[in-house]
Amino acid sequence: MDLYNLKNNMLEPVDRESFKLEKDIQGLIENNVETLFNLEFISTEFTVGDFRLDSLCFDNENNSFVIIEYKKGSSYSVIDQGYSYMSVMLNNKSDFILEYIEKTGKSLKKNEIDWSQSRIIFISQSFNSYQKNSVNFKDVPFELWEIKKYSN
């Protein structure tokens, strides 16, 4: 879809740009996660066992954790990565609670969290059709969000 700026009743095309690095996407989202997703940012590059989670957030409305993963391009490993991260979260609940307490200074008990509402958000400049179709199943705890960058 093309975008235009309106100036003096004339349309000027807006050029699309690419994010050069995955970190550029990550920084933008982490700084604006409350505005974009109504989530509380907890931690960046959170490590649990052998896994490094890009962004850890908390959904105060649903009392659940949300992991955000960033992809520079369309990767084929989105769904298996999502299930791995969901498994890591559900098998290491105390690590997530401890990270929340350490980063926010607020108390949180295991029984206050609705683990069934936990989810993974993937953000990329594009996803392939297989990835888009794979999240159409009911109750799949994954969301795919495409991000676009435009000049000026």
PLM regions: where:
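Charged, terminal alpha-helix-loop-beta segments
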Residues: 1-152
